[in-house]
Regions:
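Non-catalytic C-terminal accessory region of glycerolipid acyltransferases
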Residues: 1-18, 111-236
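A transmembrane-helix-recognition feature enriched in membrane-embedded lipid enzymes
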Residues: 2-47, 89-98
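Catalytic core of membrane glycerolipid acyltransferases/transacylases, capturing the structured
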Residues: 49-107
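A secondary-structure boundary/capping signal
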Residues: 44, 58, 81-82, 99, ...
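A generic structural signal for well-ordered alpha-helical segments
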Residues: 33-35, 72, 94-95, 119, ...
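Short, basic, glycine/proline-bearing loop/turn elements
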Residues: 29-30, 97-103, 133-138
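Flexible, charged surface loops at secondary-structure boundaries
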Residues: 47-50, 121
């Protein structure tokens, strides 16, 4: 089965994952050890609406998606992942059945956009890392990579808000040179909803402004999460 054929498997009708039971069991199997071993804490989770939204966060570790997923008991959360991950047959099967959406990076992936829009219209949530790839290779992890407009474009077309998310601590789980994982404190900080309608100008100007504001909020939320971790260390 080729990549294009696999892209439709996670969905029934307007976007339901193929196996809800598998998703629920995966949530339990992934979230319990993550919440236990890595001492994950959520800040301001009340900012997450009950309805559809796009979560947009910084990306410095392969654990970012798993940590964010473990924080979302309210309902399904679907991630957008680079299509290169689908080269592995087992990983492709797992991602398909968990409702993950492959995206062709560097292109206007209309298939991914239509699938995401269907999920959002069905009331689900979608998570996107605007940087497009992990920032682990950057010299300075404090600097976020160049943001893509995908999250803002989707929010604009689906008429849903973006929830900026600052993730801090995941980069310490498996730092460069480490042979074994570590178990740091991880904080996930959720920001207030941002909408394209919050800005003035043309459609394009609103799109760019939404992307800039989202990235600005992600940095601020991550920095606040970092301060919280340092406070906890001081009280330990």
């Amino acid at each position: 089965m080729n990549h294009q054929d696999r892209r439709g498997l996670p969905f029934k009708g307007e976007g339901a994952p193929k196996h809800w039971a598998l998703m629920k069991w995966a949530y339990v199997l992934i979230s319990l050890p993550i919440l236990g071993m890595y001492r994950v804490e959520a800040m301001n989770e009340d900012n997450i609406p009950d309805g559809p939204c796009i979560l947009a966060g910084n990306h410095v570790s392969y654990m970012d998606a798993a940590v964010l997923w473990s924080m979302m008991p309210k309902g399904p959360l679907h991630f957008v992942a680079k299509e290169e991950l689908y080269k592995s047959k087992f990983l492709a099967w797992a991602l398909d059945n968990l409702g993950v959406l492959p995206v062709s990076r560097g292109t206007a992936d209309r298939t991914m956009i239509s699938r995401c829009k269907a999920l959002l219209q069905a009331g689900d949530r979608v998570a996107i890392f605007p940087e497009g790839t992990r920032g682990r290779e950057r010299e300075n992890l404090d600097e976020l990579g160049q943001a893509q407009n995908g999250a803002a474009f989707l929010a604009q077309h689906a008429k849903v808000p973006i929830i900026p998310v600052g993730i801090e601590g995941t980069e310490k789980i498996m730092p460069k040179g480490a042979k074994f994982p570590r178990f740091p404190k991880v904080v996930v900080n959720f920001g207030h909803p941002i909408s394209a309608d919050d800005f003035e100008g043309s459609r394009r100007e609103k799109l760019d402004a939404l992307t800039r504001e989202t990235m600005k909020e992600i940095v601020a939320l991550r920095d606040t999460a970092r301060v919280e971790i340092e406070k906890r260390k001081g009280r330990a």
